[in-house]
């Protein structure tokens, strides 16, 4: 977990990046993850704009949960997805990349080694207070670290 706070006008922005334990992890590890994340969320002032992004290793599915998810998630909710939804309910957060209808390739963020299965396990969380500001939320499973780095580094030609 990492966090950065940007000073801005009229609001400061706090961004948290997470990597949640997988379903193979001990249950206690999952509990520690959410406890640590909750502690981290207590640090910035409540008026900050808050983003939490990352690999949640959870499937929230396409079933809408009012105030938390839209109906445009991928697949069927699993236990980790239910835990993520409960965390969002407790903290007034939206799972933004379930709010907008998109092509399936813009939803899935994990592909099985044999290429037969895709899951949506990476999410962008945003405070419910700021719902009207969200215009789009997309993921790109095909974007590699090398592509990201190449786009950030100056051209050396």
Which residue ranges define each predicted feature?
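A shared catalytic/ligand-binding motif for oxyanion handling
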Residues: 1-157
